[in-house]
Amino acid sequence: MSAIPNASNTSASTSFDAHRPLTLADINDPSTKHVIVGMSGGVDSSVSAVLLQQAGFMVEGLFMKNWEEDDGTEYCTAMDDLADAQAVCDKIGIKLHTANFAMEYWDRVFEHFLAEYKAGRTPNPDILCNKEIKFKAFLDYALTLGADYIATGHYTRRSVNYKNNDGIEVAQLLRGLDNNKDQSYFLHAVGGDKLAKTLFPVGELKKPVVRQIAEEHDLITANKKDSTGICFIGERRFKDFLQQYLPAQKGDIVTDDGITIGTHDGLMYYTLGQRGGIGIGGVKDRPEEPWFVLAKDLDNNRLIVGQGHEHAMMLSNELQAYKLDWVDVLPPADIFSEDGLRCMAKSRYRQPDQACTVFANNENGSEVRVVFDEPQRAVTPGQSAVFYIDEVCLGGGVIASIDAPCGI
């Protein structure tokens, strides 16, 4: 495995084998291994079940219901998704279990989601859902059913198992081979000890190939549209959903030089860098250029806006992150050094890798300071900063704050 210039070894980098991608062929005696696939009713989990079955594993499926809502509403697709999952399992001849994790989801994911928005931050519930539900509640339940592994349809990979410096058997999280679909960003908070019990059958495939396999097996999900957005919101407007749970307080929209030019509907509805949906028309004595959200003034309930895609108030050189989850379970040793850990980072999904240096802010590595080589645009508190060396995802944490904006 090649290293980026000046990249340092981490506690997870115990050997080359620790980074070698695991394939289904690496697992001995698959006919004796019981795998339960998280069946979402989509094409990716459907094909995952097919690939595991073809590789000789004992395969069963499990459909999770994580959100309680009237199944007859236009927004809830749970019944249709369950029907599709059942149809796929019937087609390939495997059993489908069902489990309701709605209580766990509310307690561990949704309440945090609401608290973050109330505090003016922009959370990513999918990351917490993976950590707390799909790779904790689901994994624990599957183990009670006698599973040796769980499997999901995520476009990511993991390494062969190895023991970290504390003797815990773990696996590394690796990027999926389809760069356009790689989901390692969303799985960075899943511990390596959980990954060691997980298989990602489609992680080495590209999406068109996955759909082709589904078509070849005449699966009902072959041409099913990919789900997008936050799972419990569905296709409804985000603002309509959120106002059911959090009362909104209108306030002033203020320019970067202090001029009030409008009224916002509630700070929680806006995110840094946002362009559309602000509700600003033509402004006297201002150029006909787009307006962007630059900041939220929580104390005064003001939305700060300005013009210019690269406005100085949207650019920052550093961020502070907390609630760090390290895939290796142990933090990389170099974050405690004077020079820090050289690596790449993403502060949002699909962002190109950004070179940076990571320094620990406390003794256990659960809080860090990240210094970027180049200024970053619209780094958003509540989102996650995720760290990589080559194809290996080291982990990440929640963005707490950024430094003083560049040039201000």
UniProtKB/Swiss-Prot annotation:
Top-rank EC class of the record's enzyme: transferase
Keywords of this entry: ATP-binding, Cytoplasm, Disulfide bond, Nucleotide-binding, RNA-binding, Transferase, tRNA processing, tRNA-binding
UniProt xrefs under Gene3D superfamilies: Adenine nucleotide alpha hydrolases-like domains (2.30.30.280), HUPs (3.40.50.620), Translation factors (2.40.30.10)
UniProt GO cellular component terms: cytoplasm
Chain intervals for the UniProt region annotation (Interaction with target base in tRNA): 124-126
Region listing for Interaction with tRNA, in residue ranges: 181-183, 348-349
One GO-annotated biological process of the protein: tRNA wobble position uridine thiolation
Reactions accelerated catalytically: S-sulfanyl-L-cysteinyl-[protein] + uridine(34) in tRNA + AH2 + ATP = 2-thiouridine(34) in tRNA + L-cysteinyl-[protein] + A + AMP + diphosphate + H(+)
Superkingdom assignment: Bacteria
Location relative to the cell: Cytoplasm
Site (Interaction with tRNA): H154, Q383
Disulfide bridges in this chain: C129-C231
Pfam families: tRNA_Me_trans (PF03054), tRNA_Me_trans_C (PF20258), tRNA_Me_trans_M (PF20259)
Main subcellular location: cytoplasm
Active site location: C129, C231
Residues reported to bind ATP: G38, M39, S40, G41, G42, V43, D44, S45, M64, G153
UniProt EC number: 2.8.1.13
Residues spanning the signal sequence: none
InterPro entries: MnmA-like (IPR004506), MnmA-like_C (IPR046885), MnmA-like_central (IPR046884), MnmA-like_central_sf (IPR023382), Rossmann-like_a/b/a_fold (IPR014729)
HAMAP family: tRNA_thiouridyl_MnmA
Entry similarity comment: Belongs to the MnmA/TRMU family.
Task of the protein: Catalyzes the 2-thiolation of uridine at the wobble position (U34) of tRNA, leading to the formation of s(2)U34.
The protein, known as: tRNA-specific 2-thiouridylase MnmA
Organism: Psychrobacter cryohalolentis (strain ATCC BAA-1226 / DSM 17306 / VKM B-2378 / K5)
